[in-house]
Amino acid sequence: RQQSRIYLGQKEKKFIRGPAIGPVIQNTRNLIVADLDGDKKPEILIANRRAANLIYNHTTKGDLLKGRIIGSGADSTIDVAIGDLNGDGLPDVVLANRDGQPNAIYLNNDNRQFGNTIAYGTGKDNTRSVTLADMNGDGHLDIIAANVAQSNRVFFNNGKGAFPKSTSFGGAQSP
């Protein structure tokens, strides 16, 4: 196993090996880059299976700080999506988990931290991919989850970061 690593883009349209991030034991499955704290610098969120999901913040010098945990610390995360789910203008985090762990939403608090966990799905989904899009034209980002050995689902956002309705498509149990 190896650490995740950053490769730095050069003017000559090539990349050079940059710093390693995260522990060597990491089981990285996905990552996403976004400004999660409103400082106009992108953070890196690394999604790990059977290990902590970690957010790495930039310093004013451009260095990465030690990762802070988002999630339970022992999630089985396969994918991650970011978008404003409750209309407060702050980016929220959606985790797609497997191995019998519930999928989770983390709403961004006013202090740019991620608070309470909101579960979505059955709690025992085997989700492999998650994305956000307004699927019903109401102006709110909905969650689209692709699952293994069960139906894929769209979870409809009520505009407050809650997903009381869903529908299935494709997969094992769709109509």
Regions inferred by a protein language model and the residue ranges of each:
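Blade-edge motifs of beta-propeller repeat domains
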Residues: 5-26, 56-76, 107-125, 156-175
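Beta-propeller blade termini
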Residues: 29-38, 78-87, 128-135, 175
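Hydrophobic beta-strand segments that make up the repeating blades of beta-propeller
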Residues: 1, 44-48, 93-97, 143-147
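Short coil/loop residues immediately preceding or within conserved phosphate-binding loops
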Residues: 28, 50, 77, 100, ...
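Structural signal for beta-propeller blades
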Residues: 3-6, 52-55, 101-104, 151-154
